[in-house]
Protein backbone atom coordinates (compact mmCIF):
# COMPACT_ATOMS: atom_id res chain seq x y z
CA UNK A 1 0.00 0.00 0.00
CA UNK A 2 1.28 3.43 -0.93
CA UNK A 3 1.87 5.75 2.03
CA UNK A 4 1.98 9.09 0.19
CA UNK A 5 0.72 9.47 -3.36
CA UNK A 6 -0.91 11.89 -5.78
CA UNK A 7 -4.10 11.50 -7.82
CA UNK A 8 -4.75 13.56 -10.94
CA UNK A 9 -8.23 14.98 -11.54
CA UNK A 10 -9.65 16.81 -14.57
CA UNK A 11 -8.86 20.50 -15.14
CA UNK A 12 -5.37 20.27 -13.69
CA UNK A 13 -6.44 19.45 -10.14
CA UNK A 14 -4.17 17.21 -8.05
CA UNK A 15 -4.96 15.65 -4.67
CA UNK A 16 -2.30 14.42 -2.23
CA UNK A 17 -3.26 11.32 -0.23
CA UNK A 18 -1.63 9.92 2.92
CA UNK A 19 -2.45 6.31 3.80
CA UNK A 20 -5.56 6.55 1.65
CA UNK A 21 -6.82 9.80 3.21
CA UNK A 22 -6.92 13.06 1.21
CA UNK A 23 -4.63 15.73 2.68
CA UNK A 24 -5.04 18.69 0.32
CA UNK A 25 -5.58 19.59 -3.33
CA UNK A 26 -4.08 22.15 -5.66
CA UNK A 27 -4.25 23.30 -9.27
CA UNK A 28 -1.19 22.17 -11.19
CA UNK A 29 -1.52 25.23 -13.42
CA UNK A 30 -1.44 27.52 -10.38
CA UNK A 31 0.22 25.80 -7.42
CA UNK A 32 -0.41 28.78 -5.16
CA UNK A 33 -4.13 28.12 -5.31
CA UNK A 34 -5.08 25.40 -2.82
CA UNK A 35 -8.55 23.97 -2.65
CA UNK A 36 -10.48 23.89 0.58
CA UNK A 37 -11.79 20.72 2.13
CA UNK A 38 -15.56 21.00 2.61
CA UNK A 39 -16.80 21.51 6.16
CA UNK A 40 -20.18 19.97 5.36
CA UNK A 41 -21.04 16.49 4.12
CA UNK A 42 -22.07 16.82 0.47
CA UNK A 43 -23.54 14.05 -1.67
CA UNK A 44 -24.10 14.18 -5.43
CA UNK A 45 -26.73 11.69 -6.55
CA UNK A 46 -28.75 10.43 -9.49
CA UNK A 47 -31.00 7.45 -10.21
CA UNK A 48 -28.00 5.12 -10.01
CA UNK A 49 -26.93 6.12 -6.50
CA UNK A 50 -24.85 8.78 -4.79
CA UNK A 51 -21.26 9.59 -3.90
CA UNK A 52 -19.77 11.93 -1.34
CA UNK A 53 -17.46 14.76 -2.38
CA UNK A 54 -14.82 16.31 -0.14
CA UNK A 55 -13.45 19.48 -1.80
CA UNK A 56 -14.92 22.73 -3.04
CA UNK A 57 -13.72 22.21 -6.61
CA UNK A 58 -15.94 19.11 -6.80
CA UNK A 59 -19.11 21.13 -6.17
CA UNK A 60 -21.41 21.71 -9.16
CA UNK A 61 -20.88 25.05 -10.88
CA UNK A 62 -22.32 28.11 -9.10
CA UNK A 63 -22.97 26.35 -5.78
CA UNK A 64 -21.04 27.84 -2.87
CA UNK A 65 -20.80 26.70 0.75
CA UNK A 66 -19.86 28.88 3.69
CA UNK A 67 -19.90 29.07 7.46
CA UNK A 68 -19.22 26.33 9.97
CA UNK A 69 -21.28 23.90 11.98
CA UNK A 70 -20.97 20.14 12.27
CA UNK A 71 -22.59 17.10 10.70
CA UNK A 72 -24.68 19.10 8.21
CA UNK A 73 -25.74 17.11 5.14
CA UNK A 74 -26.38 18.48 1.65
CA UNK A 75 -27.76 16.32 -1.17
CA UNK A 76 -27.62 17.70 -4.72
CA UNK A 77 -28.98 15.96 -7.80
CA UNK A 78 -26.38 15.94 -10.58
CA UNK A 79 -28.83 17.51 -13.08
CA UNK A 80 -29.51 20.58 -10.92
CA UNK A 81 -29.21 23.87 -12.80
CA UNK A 82 -27.86 26.39 -10.30
CA UNK A 83 -27.11 30.10 -10.57
CA UNK A 84 -25.34 31.70 -7.63
CA UNK A 85 -26.65 29.34 -4.97
CA UNK A 86 -25.03 30.06 -1.61
CA UNK A 87 -25.56 27.81 1.42
CA UNK A 88 -24.27 29.27 4.69
CA UNK A 89 -24.27 27.51 8.04
CA UNK A 90 -23.91 29.34 11.34
CA UNK A 91 -21.04 28.09 13.48
CA UNK A 92 -23.50 26.78 16.08
CA UNK A 93 -25.59 24.68 13.69
CA UNK A 94 -25.54 20.90 13.44
CA UNK A 95 -27.45 17.99 11.94
CA UNK A 96 -29.15 20.11 9.27
CA UNK A 97 -30.39 18.50 6.06
CA UNK A 98 -30.61 20.26 2.69
CA UNK A 99 -31.97 18.49 -0.41
CA UNK A 100 -31.70 20.40 -3.70
CA UNK A 101 -33.94 18.51 -6.13
CA UNK A 102 -34.73 14.91 -5.25
CA UNK A 103 -34.63 13.34 -8.73
CA UNK A 104 -34.05 13.95 -12.44
CA UNK A 105 -35.47 16.83 -14.53
CA UNK A 106 -34.16 19.20 -11.95
CA UNK A 107 -34.86 22.74 -10.92
CA UNK A 108 -33.20 26.03 -11.81
CA UNK A 109 -32.21 27.83 -8.63
CA UNK A 110 -30.86 31.32 -7.94
CA UNK A 111 -30.96 31.80 -4.19
CA UNK A 112 -29.22 32.29 -0.89
CA UNK A 113 -29.93 29.86 1.95
CA UNK A 114 -28.81 30.68 5.48
CA UNK A 115 -29.03 28.16 8.32
CA UNK A 116 -29.18 30.14 11.54
CA UNK A 117 -28.11 28.92 14.97
CA UNK A 118 -29.99 25.76 15.73
CA UNK A 119 -30.06 22.08 14.97
CA UNK A 120 -31.93 19.62 12.77
CA UNK A 121 -33.31 22.16 10.29
CA UNK A 122 -34.59 20.63 7.04
CA UNK A 123 -34.83 22.16 3.56
CA UNK A 124 -36.37 20.23 0.68
CA UNK A 125 -36.76 21.55 -2.89
CA UNK A 126 -38.65 19.40 -5.38
CA UNK A 127 -38.50 18.80 -9.13
CA UNK A 128 -39.14 21.26 -11.96
CA UNK A 129 -39.08 24.17 -9.51
CA UNK A 130 -37.58 27.48 -10.64
CA UNK A 131 -36.37 30.14 -8.21
CA UNK A 132 -35.29 33.43 -9.80
CA UNK A 133 -34.11 35.10 -6.60
CA UNK A 134 -34.81 34.17 -3.00
CA UNK A 135 -33.32 34.44 0.46
CA UNK A 136 -34.24 31.57 2.76
CA UNK A 137 -33.59 31.53 6.53
CA UNK A 138 -34.01 28.42 8.65
CA UNK A 139 -33.39 28.03 12.36
CA UNK A 140 -34.33 26.40 15.65
CA UNK A 141 -35.17 22.98 14.23
CA UNK A 142 -37.56 24.28 11.58
CA UNK A 143 -38.48 22.82 8.19
CA UNK A 144 -39.21 24.19 4.72
CA UNK A 145 -40.77 21.98 2.06
CA UNK A 146 -40.93 23.49 -1.44
CA UNK A 147 -42.81 21.17 -3.77
CA UNK A 148 -42.60 20.20 -7.44
CA UNK A 149 -43.32 22.42 -10.44
CA UNK A 150 -43.24 25.73 -8.55
CA UNK A 151 -42.27 29.18 -9.84
CA UNK A 152 -40.72 31.75 -7.49
CA UNK A 153 -40.13 35.25 -8.81
CA UNK A 154 -37.48 37.75 -7.66
CA UNK A 155 -36.72 39.12 -4.17
CA UNK A 156 -38.60 36.35 -2.36
CA UNK A 157 -38.04 36.13 1.41
CA UNK A 158 -38.82 32.90 3.28
CA UNK A 159 -38.21 32.67 7.03
CA UNK A 160 -39.13 29.60 9.04
CA UNK A 161 -38.26 31.35 12.30
CA UNK A 162 -38.42 34.86 13.73
CA UNK A 163 -34.77 34.63 14.68
CA UNK A 164 -35.05 36.63 17.91
CA UNK A 165 -37.13 35.46 20.84
CA UNK A 166 -40.30 37.23 21.98
CA UNK A 167 -41.12 36.62 25.64
CA UNK A 168 -44.10 37.07 27.90
CA UNK A 169 -43.17 40.13 29.96
CA UNK A 170 -44.60 38.63 33.15
CA UNK A 171 -43.30 35.07 32.99
CA UNK A 172 -40.33 35.29 30.62
CA UNK A 173 -41.75 32.38 28.60
CA UNK A 174 -40.86 32.38 24.90
CA UNK A 175 -44.10 32.77 22.93
CA UNK A 176 -42.97 32.83 19.30
CA UNK A 177 -41.87 29.26 18.67
CA UNK A 178 -42.59 27.93 15.20
CA UNK A 179 -45.26 25.23 15.45
CA UNK A 180 -45.42 23.67 11.99
CA UNK A 181 -43.29 23.10 8.92
CA UNK A 182 -43.38 25.87 6.32
CA UNK A 183 -44.90 24.28 3.20
CA UNK A 184 -45.18 25.55 -0.37
CA UNK A 185 -47.00 22.70 -2.10
CA UNK A 186 -46.84 21.53 -5.73
CA UNK A 187 -47.50 23.87 -8.67
CA UNK A 188 -47.45 27.16 -6.76
CA UNK A 189 -46.45 30.58 -8.13
CA UNK A 190 -44.98 33.18 -5.75
CA UNK A 191 -44.95 36.69 -7.20
CA UNK A 192 -42.32 39.41 -6.83
CA UNK A 193 -41.31 40.26 -3.22
CA UNK A 194 -43.51 37.67 -1.57
CA UNK A 195 -42.70 37.18 2.12
CA UNK A 196 -43.32 33.76 3.65
CA UNK A 197 -43.30 33.64 7.46
CA UNK A 198 -42.98 30.78 9.91
CA UNK A 199 -45.83 28.26 10.01
CA UNK A 200 -47.14 29.40 6.60
CA UNK A 201 -48.63 26.63 4.45
CA UNK A 202 -50.28 26.83 1.03
CA UNK A 203 -51.82 23.92 -0.93
CA UNK A 204 -51.32 22.82 -4.53
CA UNK A 205 -52.20 25.19 -7.39
CA UNK A 206 -51.87 28.43 -5.43
CA UNK A 207 -50.96 31.83 -6.91
CA UNK A 208 -49.48 34.41 -4.53
CA UNK A 209 -49.64 38.03 -5.70
CA UNK A 210 -46.70 40.45 -5.67
CA UNK A 211 -45.83 41.84 -2.24
CA UNK A 212 -48.02 39.39 -0.31
CA UNK A 213 -47.13 38.42 3.25
CA UNK A 214 -48.02 34.76 3.75
CA UNK A 215 -48.95 33.82 7.31
CA UNK A 216 -50.92 30.88 8.63
CA UNK A 217 -52.36 27.89 6.81
CA UNK A 218 -54.46 27.92 3.64
CA UNK A 219 -56.38 24.79 2.62
CA UNK A 220 -58.32 25.52 -0.59
CA UNK A 221 -56.56 24.79 -3.88
CA UNK A 222 -56.74 26.83 -7.11
CA UNK A 223 -56.79 30.25 -5.42
CA UNK A 224 -55.06 33.63 -5.61
CA UNK A 225 -53.76 35.01 -2.31
CA UNK A 226 -52.90 38.69 -1.91
CA UNK A 227 -52.35 41.35 0.74
CA UNK A 228 -50.74 41.78 4.16
CA UNK A 229 -51.58 39.49 5.76
CA UNK A 230 -52.44 37.34 2.75
CA UNK A 231 -56.06 36.39 2.10
CA UNK A 232 -57.84 34.59 -0.72
CA UNK A 233 -59.13 37.07 -3.32
CA UNK A 234 -60.08 34.69 -6.14
CA UNK A 235 -60.92 30.99 -6.49
CA UNK A 236 -61.12 28.50 -9.33
CA UNK A 237 -57.86 29.53 -11.02
CA UNK A 238 -54.63 27.92 -12.18
CA UNK A 239 -51.54 29.08 -14.10
CA UNK A 240 -49.08 28.02 -16.78
CA UNK A 241 -45.33 28.46 -17.04
CA UNK A 242 -45.91 29.65 -20.61
CA UNK A 243 -46.55 33.32 -21.41
CA UNK A 244 -49.91 34.72 -22.56
CA UNK A 245 -48.39 35.29 -26.00
CA UNK A 246 -47.22 31.69 -26.29
CA UNK A 247 -50.59 30.26 -25.30
CA UNK A 248 -52.55 32.55 -27.64
CA UNK A 249 -50.34 31.61 -30.59
CA UNK A 250 -50.27 27.84 -30.25
Regions found by a protein language model. Give the residues of each.
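Domain-scale signature associated with acetyltransferase and cell-envelope carbohydrate enzymes
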Residues: 1-160, 179-187, 194-199, 204, ...
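Flexible, solvent-exposed loop segments that connect beta-strands
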Residues: 168-175
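Amphipathic helical hotspot of TIR/SEFIR-family domains
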Residues: 207
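Conserved metal-binding segment of the jelly-roll/cupin
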Residues: 211
Amino acid sequence: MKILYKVRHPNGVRTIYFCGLPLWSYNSHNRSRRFRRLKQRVFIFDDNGEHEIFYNYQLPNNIHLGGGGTNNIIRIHKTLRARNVCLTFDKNTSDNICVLCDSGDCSGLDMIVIFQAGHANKLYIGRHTVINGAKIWLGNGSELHLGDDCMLSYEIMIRTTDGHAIMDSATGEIINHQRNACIISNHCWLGLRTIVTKNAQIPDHTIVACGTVLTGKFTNTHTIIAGNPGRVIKTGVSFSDKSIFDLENI
